[in-house]
């Protein structure tokens, strides 16, 4: 199949546009008494008494004993802080990446407070499953995050979540195989060792196309009418590169944990992932583990920068909850500076709080450096317009067709 035709078929599959839904804004004026939102001392004993059961959803790792039961401990600390509130917490498991799909199916039956990846935001808004925040909560968010992070949880000037980390992927590599100059070029790395990349994962494959000037919903990722532009000569050239990449004896498609297991046993020398794999890799590789922003790749003699999708993970509030003042305060508490510090200590979740990022210990962390350099230098803000939902499956299937040798 011709590469231009193949790229056009992928584009056609991703171009069905969906419509914007209405946003829930019932908490736009909701004030919160969380200590993180106010610089002055708060008298929690002045709060009206509340007895309530609050449902909180988050990833399994944040509730696991091996990671210190971060979520439970932070909720218990919140309960102790609010002396007039008698709160019982019920926990459920839902990863940030699954929040949109899961919660939008039954908003009224879902958690009061939950964690979500910002690419899920428009889905949650369309389903009436996430509340617009306001008041001192938004003041705190804007005072403690970069503009890019704030933008990642903002739609039509409305803020919908309390960010707690940047969300992107970068490169892990074996320092015993690659030097600092080697890791600048993907093609150089392929000459010297085995490289694993999740080409059948739609969150990753776009990095090559964006690197060659292809766009998703315009330059800012917000123009639905512009659609996805992966067709034409630019898209065809990238597709040809990827077909050749799959044919390289040193390339391994990363699926079902192949990259992590290979890095740990030494059969793979570089992979692309995020902070969620850091602990396992660090324990297995020790000082040989290197972390870096994305490399370039050579397309027809030109070095092009790979660019990942980037965004944030945040704490959201369900507008259907019975006790919005509790839910908003808890969301802010789970995303405040102290909670981000404990998250970092427990699971190496890189903070986005600007005060924490200024601390010397965190600034020296190789993981933090790589994640922030990738976010700032080798990524684009992942579009979260409704039509982006039509990208994921066609992109995944297109990657599979390349890996399976259906394009040649």
Labelled PLM ranges:
Residues 283-346:
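Extracytoplasmic/periplasmic substrate-recognition and gating elements
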Residues 36-44, 116-170, 181, 290-294, ...:
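Hinge/lid segment of periplasmic solute-binding proteins
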Residues 224-255:
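Glycine-centered hinge/linker elements that transmit conformational signals in sensory
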Residues 309, 347-351, 368-408:
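C-terminal capping/gating helix-and-loop segments adjacent to ligand/active sites or protein-protein/ligand interfaces
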Residues 5-8, 21-120:
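Conserved N-terminal structural module of periplasmic/extracytoplasmic solute-binding proteins
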Residues 81-144, 160-161, 269-270, 280, ...:
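Extracytoplasmic "Venus flytrap"/periplasmic binding protein-like
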Residues 103-104, 109-112, 139-173, 194-198, ...:
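A structural signal for short loop-to-beta-strand junctions that line the ligand-binding cleft
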Residues 119, 124-129, 146-183, 198-223, ...:
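Periplasmic solute-binding protein
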């Amino acid at each position: 199949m011709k590469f231009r035709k193949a790229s056009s078929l992928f584009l056609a599959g991703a171009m069905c546009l969906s419509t914007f839904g209405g946003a829930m804004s019932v908490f736009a004026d909701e004030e919160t008494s969380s200590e993180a939102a106010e610089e002055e001392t708060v008298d929690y004993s002045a709060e009206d008494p509340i007895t309530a059961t609050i449902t909180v959803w988050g990833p399994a790792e944040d509730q696991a004993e091996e990671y210190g039961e971060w979520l439970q401990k932070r909720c218990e600390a919140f309960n102790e802080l609010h002396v007039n509130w008698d709160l019982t917490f019920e926990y459920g498991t839902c990863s940030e990446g699954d929040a949109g799909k899961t919660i939008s199916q039954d908003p009224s039956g879902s958690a009061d407070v939950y964690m979500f990846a910002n690419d899920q935001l428009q889905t949650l808004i369309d389903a009436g499953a996430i509340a617009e925040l306001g008041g001192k909560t938004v003041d705190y968010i804007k005072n403690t995050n970069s503009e890019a992070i704030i933008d990642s949880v903002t739609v039509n000037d409305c803020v919908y979540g309390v960010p707690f980390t940047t969300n992107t992927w970068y490169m892990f590599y074996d320092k015993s195989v690659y030097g600092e100059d080697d890791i600048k070029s993907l093609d150089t790395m392929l000459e010297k060792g085995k490289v694993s990349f999740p080409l059948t994962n739609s969150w990753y494959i776009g990095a090559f196309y964006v690197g060659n000037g292809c766009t998703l919903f315009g330059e800012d990722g917000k123009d639905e009418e512009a659609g996805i532009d992966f067709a034409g000569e630019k898209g065809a050239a990238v597709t040809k590169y990827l077909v050749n990449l799959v044919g390289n004896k040193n390339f391994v498609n990363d699926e079902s944990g192949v990259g992590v297991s290979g890095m740990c046993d030494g059969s793979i020398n570089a992979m692309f992932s995020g902070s969620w794999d850091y602990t396992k890799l660090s324990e297995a590789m020790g000082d040989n583990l290197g972390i870096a922003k994305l490399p370039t790749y050579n397309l027809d003699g030109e070095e092009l920068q790979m660019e990942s999708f980037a965004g944030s993970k945040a704490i959201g509030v369900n507008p259907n909850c019975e006790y919005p003042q509790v839910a908003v305060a808890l969301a802010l508490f789970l995303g405040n500076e102290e909670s981000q510090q404990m998250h970092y200590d427990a699971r190496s979740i890189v903070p986005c709080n600007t005060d924490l990022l200024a601390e010397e210990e965190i600034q020296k962390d190789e993981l933090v450096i790589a994640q922030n350099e990738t976010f700032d230098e080798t990524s684009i803000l992942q579009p979260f317009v409704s039509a982006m939902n039509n990208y994921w499956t066609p992109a995944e299937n297109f990657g599979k067709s390349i890996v399976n040798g259906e394009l040649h």
